[in-house]
Curated annotation (Swiss-Prot):
Record-given protein name: Outer membrane protein P1
Gene3D superfamilies from the UniProt entry: Outer membrane protein transport protein (OMPP1/FadL/TodX) (2.40.160.60)
Keywords associated with the record: Cell outer membrane, Membrane, Signal, Transmembrane, Transmembrane beta strand
Keyword Heme annotated: no
Domain of life: Bacteria
Gene, per the UniProt record: ompP1
Originating species: Haemophilus influenzae
């Protein structure tokens, strides 16, 4: 067999436990108008049809049908600095043999650029009822390390996307109170590659190779399975699955100039299945078996306010709370019940606060600005795949109306993340006879530039 895969299915999600632009792997980039104000006021502002993705109750404010489409390009810069040590240890006849290899865990720009698209439509049915539909990406990440990366079991390639399809309705209960409800279908795809790195060098030691020959399969032929650093030890190619959830919102408008909104998005369970899953830890290397993993996208709650202070100036704010502690651990098993993988995540619930302002310079041009602070979710367990960190947003944006029906949104944001130090450790084997261990010490710092463009049309 050309490659063995260590907990293919579960590791796919484990190694995707990080994010460059929002806590863990949650994305905030649902619209360009929101980008320009650091997504302050999302549950209370009805700039355009993107309310489908934020608070469906806001659809009751629309007098005519509206279409909005566009996206945000994320140009991330994440640099990793550190060192890695790998060792293979075998104990036979009470005699221990150990081979230790040291290397570099440093690499620059581990996150490539990515485009986050969106598409929305809102249609009022009558004075009280409105319908809406939309497509956006609210969870996702991508990171890439060199194939020969010394800490290959932690780096490699990770590509996770969760496309959310939404159908919503809004009902105006009273002149000031509106309610909204929606259903979500999430199409998720995952691609993961992890390489042996220094593990391959440690098992090539002559004493270790000799001692391995006395072991049972699959460990006896480890040298053959791991001929080089770039040998794949985890491979999950474009596995896809569907998950379903719901969202709800309430909006209360005190008057034309003041309103508040509250929106909730439920958790979404996604069941991945891999009929070629293998696991070194479960001694399944030479032939794959069907493996199963249920992964949860967390629920979140957002409270927002909008206040038109003058004819030209408005302020808006948001508090967003995401229930990341639902992800306590990742567990994958084979059809026969044998454990393939079990990993504690230690995620913490996180908060995001944002403050923004809009200014109508003249009839055709609206300017925006905002600032936000986004708390990390993986404060107790960080990952080299994309290390999570607290980050601050600085945003600017504008909307220009070419005609009463056609407008364009432009937005820019600079995200600055805190410098973080963390360690990753991976141990394979029973620790009584054979142990393969890799330990990496990291220092990372991230920043990103975000560019948004949306086209809006009112019918």
């Amino acid at each position: 067999m050309k490659k063995f895969n260590q907990s293919l299915l579960a590791t796919a999600m484990l190694l995707a436990a990080g994010g460059a632009n929002a806590a863990a792997f949650q994305l905030a980039e649902v619209s360009t108008s929101g980008l320009g104000r650091a997504y302050a006021g999302e549950a209370a502002i009805a700039d355009n049809a993107s309310v489908v993705a934020t608070n469906p109750a806001l659809m009751s404010l629309f007098k005519t049908a509206q279409f909005s489409t566009g996206g945000v390009y994320i140009d991330s810069r994440i640099n990793m600095n550190g060192d890695v040590t790998s060792y293979a240890q075998i104990i036979t006849n009470q005699i221990g043999m150990k081979a230790i290899k040291d290397g570099s865990a440093s690499q620059r720009n581990v996150v490539p650029g990515a485009f986050v698209p969106n598409l929305y439509f809102v249609a009022p049915v009558n004075d009280k009822f409105a319908l809406g539909a939309g497509m956006n990406v609210n969870f996702g990440l991508k990171s890439e390390y060199d194939d020969s990366y010394d800490a290959g079991v932690f780096g490699g390639k990770t590509d996770l996307s969760a496309i959310n399809l939404n159908l919503s309705g809004a009902y105006r209960v009273t002149e000031g109170l509106s309610l909204g409800l929606g259903v979500n279908a999430v199409y998720a795809k995952a691609q993961v590659e992890r390489n042996a790195g220094l593990i391959a060098d440690s098992v090539k030691d002559n004493q270790i190779t000799s001692a391995l020959s006395t072991q049972q399969e699959p460990f006896r032929d480890l040298k053959k399975y791991l001929p080089s650093k770039d040998k794949s030890v985890v491979s999950l190619q474009d596995r896809a699955a569907w998950g379903f959830g719901w969202n709800a919102g309430v909006m209360y408008q005190f008057n034309e100039a003041n309103r508040i909104g509250l929106a909730y998005h439920s958790k979404v369970d996604i069941d991945f299945a891999d009929r070629t899953a293998t696991s070194l830890e479960a001694n399944v290397i030479k032939e794959g078996k069907k493996g199963n993993l249920t992964f949860t996208l967390p629920d979140y709650l957002e409270l927002s306010g909008f206040h038109q202070l003058t004819d030209k100036l408005a302020v808006h704010y948001s508090y967003k709370y995401t229930h990341w502690s639902r992800l306590t651990k990742l567990h994958a098993s084979f059809e026969d019940g044998k454990k393939a993988f079990d990993k504690e995540l230690q995620y913490s619930n996180n908060s995001r606060v944002a403050l923004g302002a809009s200014y109508n310079l003249y009839e055709k041009l609206t300017l925006r600005a905002g600032i936000a602070y986004d708390q990390a979710a993986s404060r107790h367990h960080r990952s080299a795949a994309i290390p999570d960190t607290d980050r601050t947003w600085y945003s600017l944006g504008a909307t220009y109306k070419f005609t009463p029906n056609l407008s364009v949104d432009l937005g820019y944001a600079y995200l600055k993340g805190k410098k973080v130090h963390f360690k990753e450790v991976k141990t394979i084997g029973d620790k009584r006879t054979l142990t393969l261990n890799t330990t990496a010490n990291y220092t990372s710092q991230a920043h990103a530039n975000l560019y948004g463009l949306n086209l809006n049309y009112s019918f």
